[in-house]
Amino acid sequence: LKGWFDRVLVYGGLYSGSRRYNRGHFRGKTAMCSVTAGSPEQAFMPFGRAGNMVEWLWPMHASLYYVGFDVLVPQVSYGVQGGGIRYQGEGTFRKQLEQKKAAWAERIPTLSCEPPIPFTGWDDWDEKGVLRQDHPMRWRL
């Protein structure tokens, strides 16, 4: 996927110095990542052995926002076992897989009502490109 981003989202084509973030080519359009992971959800939590899923997906979300997309919270399905690795019996896995599919089918009709992941935009920075002192995210610095 990284290679695709590098080849398709090229400077001068879909973004430029002034056509980025909330002024990007895809402003007004929505994107969302859908991901499956073989390990259980706990493995992708902060301090989990697989690493925090939010941090895994940050480069993709940031790249999508960079060219103007509003990015929705991802659809992540954990514990989708395969490749010989099993965390539970086949029957239990199949039942959980059907539940995941039903939850996804339930979410699809509501996607247009979901708020995007908050990112900073052009009006949030000063003339030097630094987050404004009064911005709510400033506490993180």
Describe the function of each predicted region.
Residues 1-61:
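Helix-loop-strand module that forms the ligand-binding subsite of alpha/beta enzymes
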Residues 47-141:
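Glycine-rich phosphate/pyrophosphate-binding loop and the adjoining helix
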